[in-house]
Amino acid sequence: MAKRHLTRRQSWRIEKIQEERAARAARRELRAVDELEGGDLGPEQTGQVIAHFGVQVEVESADGQVSRCHLRANLPALVTGDQVVWRAGNQGIGVIVAQLPRRSELCRPDMRGLLKPVAANVDRIVIVFAPRPEPHANLIDRYLIAAEHAGIQPLLLLNKADLVDESNAEGIDALLNVYRTLGYPLIEVSAFNGLAMDELRGALDGHVSVFVGQSGVGKSSLVNALLPGVDTRVGDLSTVTGKGTHTTTTARLFHFPGGGDLIDSPGIREFGLGHVSRDDVEAGFIEFRDLLGHCRFRDCKHDREPGCALLQALEDGRIMPQRMASYRHILASMPETDY
């Protein structure tokens, strides 16, 4: 079926209806909070947001008890992984009264281009890709830039390693060698047959991790393999496009038996970088770092300028051609105002 193209007026009407519905839901929540705070609430205690449902969240207390909570109107936007102060209610529903400072946050632009946090207090971003759908270095590099920009340690994870065969082995090996050469940690696993899953468990224990990657690469299947008994609605590849169908709808936090947490967030096909500048993109390519600032011209675009340190490193073999091509492709996709 062809994609429906909306007129500007139709898009405006849809957006207005959604805003009105959100406003009504917010008013209902405010009334609920007022009623709770007018009654008996327990003492303040700390907890962690383990799931977000729009106007309500699930909070886990220090003793492992999970409660549904309303949000005070003056709170900033909360995301899964946030540490909060909350008060329990006598009807089983509590109230979030404060957000504690974040150690880190992972953000990406929403459909309007506005920066939106998607997970908090993460210290490892696991970039999942697979032989099918076909992996692209450009998308992996976008995730790496986001991780470097946020100061979060990346881990590259090739899932569905059992699908590597004669038809794709050469391309997969070449892709993996690029990132191994750069020094990024990389694990090849299969949630299907259990290949190297113990190695992955060891890499995740003791960390707060988030899985990112295209739909169809098996993020939900990995969660099911790592945490038996947890159902995260696994979807199949689209037979028409070969891309994954979106399955996981709500970011959730899970605990590993040996310590550490996993935040499983919705799959995305394209990861925008509208919130980073050209300088941020350059810094996200770790092999560029020692070269930046050493070009002949301060405003060097690293294209054809004489005395460019990056072009010289490319010629000398210190920068791989495919990485330079990916860098240029990412810059070309950014708004010109960010140059």
From Swiss-Prot:
Enzyme's top EC category: hydrolase
Chief place where the protein resides: cytoplasm
Please identify the protein, giving its name as recorded.
Answer: Small ribosomal subunit biogenesis GTPase RsgA
Q: Which cofactor does it need?
A: Zn(2+)
Family listed: Belongs to the TRAFAC class YlqF/YawG GTPase family. RsgA subfamily.
Species of provenance: Pseudomonas aeruginosa (strain UCBPP-PA14)
Q: Does the keyword Transferase apply?
A: no
Key word Transferase present: no
Q: Give me the segments passing through the membrane.
A: none
Free-text remark on how the cofactor is bound = Binds 1 zinc ion per subunit.
